[in-house]
């Protein structure tokens, strides 16, 4: 990885170079991939658009081969539309989209591993919901996704993002931390604020084990997708 190997490195580079966190990650990715920053940004935008496509192509009729997953994302949407969700509009939409993505994964639909297939619902749910509810541009969400990617790369280098190796705290925990940093940026946080947000998110996930029913990434995995953001 170019230039940074820890969250502290990312924050210091942001402060010293007078760059926002997403710019630090973009520069590092361009260096690592031998690509222009414009091309890296375009690549990340395609990734974000793939998340959108996965959300739009959710099929409420599908069920996983085990029959344990499917249809709950639709139920959550109906509940949100009833106006009775005590969590509010934004969190309600986040929960809906996280469920949809997790169920799509269990039903063998196309998703974006972020950072893994098992945790695929967290980051898209947060970013897509923020774009929908707060009307930010797609490019702003891509910048948040770059920040999330940088955080994920640091975690993968120093620890693990695999549930099988580090428990669900490593998989859902990493996704939650990545999403928190991106969300903090869109809310106006500086690099230190983003770092604090990811730390709070990750600490709240510590201790989660990987012990799914029947060894499938369905129960409790899908429920954890919408409780972790």
Predicted regions and their residues:
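Generic N-terminal targeting/processing segments that precede catalytic cores or assembly contacts
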Residues: 1-109
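Structural helix-adjacent loops and short alpha-helical linkers that scaffold large soluble proteins
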Residues: 87, 135-141, 188-194
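Acidic-glycine-rich active-site phosphate/pyrophosphate-binding loop
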Residues: 88-105, 140-159, 202-211
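Short acidic, glycine/Ser/Thr-rich loop/turn "cap" segments at secondary-structure junctions
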Residues: 106-114, 130, 160-164
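Conserved phosphate/anionic-ligand binding catalytic regions in large, soluble enzymes, centered on
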Residues: 111-126, 171-175
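Alpha-helical support elements that line or immediately flank enzyme active sites
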Residues: 124-135, 183-188
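Hydrophobic alpha-helical bundle architecture
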Residues: 158-170, 174, 180-223
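Conserved small/polar residues in nucleotide/adenosyl-binding loops
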Residues: 226-229
């Amino acid at each position: 990885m170019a230039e940074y190997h820890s969250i502290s490195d990312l924050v210091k580079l942001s402060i010293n170079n007078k760059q926002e966190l997403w710019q630090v990650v973009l520069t590092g990715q361009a260096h690592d991939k031998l690509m222009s920053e414009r091309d890296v940004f375009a690549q990340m935008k395609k990734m974000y658009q793939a998340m959108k496509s996965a959300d739009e192509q959710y099929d409420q009729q599908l069920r996983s081969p085990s029959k344990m997953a499917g249809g709950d994302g639709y139920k959550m949407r109906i509940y949100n539309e009833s106006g009775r969700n005590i969590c509010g509009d934004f969190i309600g939409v986040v929960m809906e989209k996280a469920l949809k993505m997790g169920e799509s994964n269990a039903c063998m639909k196309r998703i974006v591993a972020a950072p893994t297939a098992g945790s695929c619902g967290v980051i898209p749910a947060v970013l897509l919901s923020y774009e929908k509810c707060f009307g930010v541009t797609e490019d702003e969400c891509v910048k948040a996704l770059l920040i999330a990617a940088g955080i994920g790369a640091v975690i993968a280098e120093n620890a693990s993002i695999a549930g099988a190796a580090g428990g669900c705290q490593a998989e859902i925990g990493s996704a939650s931390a990545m999403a928190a940093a991106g969300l903090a940026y869109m809310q106006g946080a500086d690099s230190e604020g983003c770092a604090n947000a990811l730390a709070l998110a990750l600490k709240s996930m510590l201790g989660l084990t990987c012990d799914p029913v029947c060894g499938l990434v369905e129960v409790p995995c899908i429920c954890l997708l919408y409780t972790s953001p």
